[in-house]
């Protein structure tokens, strides 16, 4: 069963208080609880891995502003931030709160973690974008405002399956066919399935369901970019659409077998492909790679000593 929680990302805090904490370590007596908290805050700072730190002069701030592990660097370089892109960054909420005049509210409505900002500024809610937001708190707001829901958008929201089951007459079945949390519901209503759209559904069970109905022709353009279809793609390399495979977040081991087929602009931003990216450093796209969260690592406490 597809678990939508796997898309929820943990955002670690900024390290702006490092200097003051160092003073506490050097000049103050503190209890064990203080020490544990300080060590924990240090262990949560992200820094560039050595290779990318050596190429820091190539930073593209527009793409870096989208990188959820780049908050520490962005906080120290606020004049270089692309604020529209930052509004889409799920780990940038505190930085946005500190700069309300820079907020693009339409983009924040689609930000997984933007719900607290919207609760503080309810007049800024855009109901179309909020209908696409998978945060459970967004779903709670939508439940309380049925008349404002965009049902076409909500139909593909994996966190909204309970609302949809209670409002079957409002479902957009084409959009629902994309919903990774709707497979059981779709199986109960096979005549409503859009068999072209279900080929883009990232739930692996969607591909199994497709294969159980050979009367519906596989569209390899759509299937090739589906992360839930990777086993099917591995077994049918002659049918893969290589242009769309590169955007598939689970495709790196297959692409590794066919490096001449890679679109490096797309691959460079793929988190799961960092090992493949580092295998061909001369191929890196030095714009899109700065969006890749795995160009960062957690700094160890020893690096502060």
For each feature predicted by the language model, list its residue ranges.
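Alpha-helical scaffold segments
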Residues: 7-305
């Amino acid at each position: 069963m597809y678990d939508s929680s796997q898309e929820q990302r943990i955002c670690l805090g900024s390290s702006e208080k490092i200097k003051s904490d160092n003073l506490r370590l050097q000049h103050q007596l503190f209890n064990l609880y203080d020490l544990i908290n300080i060590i924990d805050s240090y262990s949560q700072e992200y820094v560039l891995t050595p290779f990318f730190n050596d190429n820091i002069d190539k930073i593209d701030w527009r793409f870096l502003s989208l990188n959820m592990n780049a908050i520490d660097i962005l906080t120290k370089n606020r004049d270089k931030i692309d604020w529209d892109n930052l509004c889409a960054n799920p780990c940038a909420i505190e930085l946005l709160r500190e700069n309300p005049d820079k907020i693009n509210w339409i983009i924040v409505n689609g930000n997984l973690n933007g719900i607290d900002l919207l609760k503080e500024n309810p007049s800024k809610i855009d109901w179309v974008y909020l209908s696409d937001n998978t945060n459970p708190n967004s779903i709670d707001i939508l439940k309380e405002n049925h008349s404002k829901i965009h049902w076409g958008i909500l139909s593909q929201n994996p966190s909204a399956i309970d609302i949809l089951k209670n409002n079957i007459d409002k479902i957009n079945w084409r959009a629902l066919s994309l919903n990774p949390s709707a497979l059981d519901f779709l199986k109960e209503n096979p005549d409503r399935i859009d068999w072209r759209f279900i080929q883009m559904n990232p739930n692996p069970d969607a591909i199994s369901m497709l294969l159980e109905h050979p009367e519906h022709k596989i569209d390899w353009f759509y299937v090739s970019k589906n992360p839930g279809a990777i086993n099917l793609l591995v077994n049918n390399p002659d049918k893969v659409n290589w242009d769309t495979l590169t955007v598939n977040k689970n495709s790196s081991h297959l692409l590794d077998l066919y490096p001449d087929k890679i679109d490096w602009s797309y691959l460079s931003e793929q988190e799961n492909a960092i090992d493949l990216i580092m295998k061909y450093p001369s191929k890196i796209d030095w714009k899109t790679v700065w969006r890749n969260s795995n160009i960062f690592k957690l700094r160890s406490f020893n690096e502060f000593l």
